[in-house]
Amino acid sequence: MSAPEHAAGLDGVAATRPRVEALTRPHRLRPGARVAVVAPSGPVPEERLRAGLDILRGWDLDPVVAPHVLDTHPTLGHLAGADRARARDLTEAWCDPAVSAVICARGGFGAQRMVDIVDWRAIREAGPKVFVGYSDITALHEAFALRAGYATLHGPMVAAGTFLSDPRTQESLRATLFEPESVRTLGLEMARALAPGRARGVTLGGCVSLFTADLGTPYGRPSARGGLLLLEDVGEEPYRLDRVLTQLLRSGRLDGVAGIGLGSWAECGPYEEVRAVLLDRLGGLGVPVVEEMGFGHSETALTMPLGVSGVLDAERGTLTLDVPALR
């Protein structure tokens, strides 16, 4: 007997909230494509950036580094330069007709500070392009979804340690960029059900603390109704994960969610304690929940498309996309 397929949004409250809809997918990359590297968040180590650029060149891509990528804010050392400079780099890279993709150099903190300075009208007028990042970049994934209607890639960043050291992480991104039909079924071998079931929906999410921080902002997502919510985090102790998940529950953001896929919880304490929080806060929603899918701050970080419809199967530990991540 197959697992039950959950239909989100059937209760009265959740049904009044807007559904998560599939977004416009950008085109896949071709050999020789120009890729802009930007730093919306924290300062970028130059040696690691160079190593990441070499990997991209090895894929026959043409990476160009935005003007302020190696900046450091004069008084706030956790930022890669001034907010307006970082926002301008992203806007100009996106609006450059020669650029096919924009990949972030690293996370940290800072995307929330610049997201409202980005020229979203110009972004919309320029049309969809490939956008890649994770962690702090969750704020921009949400903005591209809600302000531009573009699907994006929750994937490794150019100067991130996992991208530099793990061949499987590299291959997941490379295949998604060039051969997206080959990676329509996602999930590492260790993935398993935290709560049973099978659900169809549209992917969204990212770093749970950043996803939660968007609550109450002018462009914050009203709900995850009909969505397959992908969550992970780093450096958040179990009680802090409890807090952000409880906030998501109390705010109604999880009303009508179709299913939940969980990635890594690096430096969040013993996994048994983290798992207990995840089960307590998410296990009672009546939707499938898959743990250890292999995305985020993990030794192997799969590229996960956001804004694409698919099926989450808890028993198989997989997310299967209805269409390739890129056209």
Task: List the model feature ranges, each with a label.
Residues S2-A98:
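ATP/NTP phosphate-donor binding region
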Residues V37, V102, D136, F211, ...:
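Buried hydrophobic positions in well-ordered alpha/beta secondary-structure cores of metabolic enzymes
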Residues P43-I55, R198, V202-V234:
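Conserved beta-alpha junction segments in alpha/beta enzyme cores
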Residues A101-I117:
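N-terminal glycine-rich "phosphate-gripper" loop used for MgATP/nucleotide binding
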Residues V118-A143, A151-M157, L285-V289:
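Short, acidic/small-residue loops that bind anionic groups at enzyme active sites
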Residues G149-T212, G216:
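Conserved anion/nucleotide-ligand pocket segment
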Residues Y219-V274:
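Internal helical hairpin/lid segments
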Residues L262-R327:
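ATP/nucleoside-binding phosphotransfer catalytic cores, i.e., glycine-rich phosphate-binding loops
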